[in-house]
Curated annotation (Swiss-Prot):
Catalytic activity line of the entry: 1-(5-phospho-beta-D-ribosyl)-ATP + H2O = 1-(5-phospho-beta-D-ribosyl)-5'-AMP + diphosphate + H(+)
MF GO annotations: ATP binding; phosphoribosyl-ATP diphosphatase activity
Protein name (database record): Phosphoribosyl-ATP pyrophosphatase
EC number: 3.6.1.31
CDD domains: NTP-PPase_HisIE_like
Pathway: Amino-acid biosynthesis; L-histidine biosynthesis; L-histidine from 5-phospho-alpha-D-ribose 1-diphosphate: step 2/9
Classification via Gene3D superfamilies: MazG-like
Compartment annotation: Cytoplasm
Gene it is expressed from: hisE
């Protein structure tokens, strides 16, 4: 895992037990999963809009910024659920060399 992800995962874990007024992340944890999911949704929409704008303008700076926000809030969500970013990286590794069609077919039906 990248050093940045490792450091971020460590900080996110530390903030779980911090006072709500001590940091933005601690305040999200104290507000609960629904607030965190709201932020993930908000950042998803902002990332989509930034990508559409980048396709027109050729300037990807906003899409990079918004993607960082989306990843960040997704990592907060995973931490809230007791999951580590390594679990996502492991899943991506598992999919390497596997056709997208084969991967989709291997999923249990919902």
């Amino acid at each position: 895992m990248s050093d940045t992800l490792t450091r971020l995962a460590q900080v996110l874990e530390e903030r779980k037990d911090a006072a709500a007024d001590s940091s933005y992340v601690a305040s999200l944890y104290h507000k609960g999963l629904n607030k965190i999911l709201e932020k993930v949704g908000e950042e998803s929409v902002e990332t989509i809009i930034a990508a559409k704008d980048a396709a027109i303008s050729g300037d990807c700076s906003d899409v990079i910024y918004e993607t960082a926000d989306l990843w960040f809030h997704t990592l907060v969500m995973l931490a809230q659920l007791g999951q580590h970013p390594q679990a996502v990286l492991d899943e991506l590794d598992r999919r390497f060399g596997l056709s997208g069609h084969a991967e989709k077919a291997s999923r249990p039906s919902a």
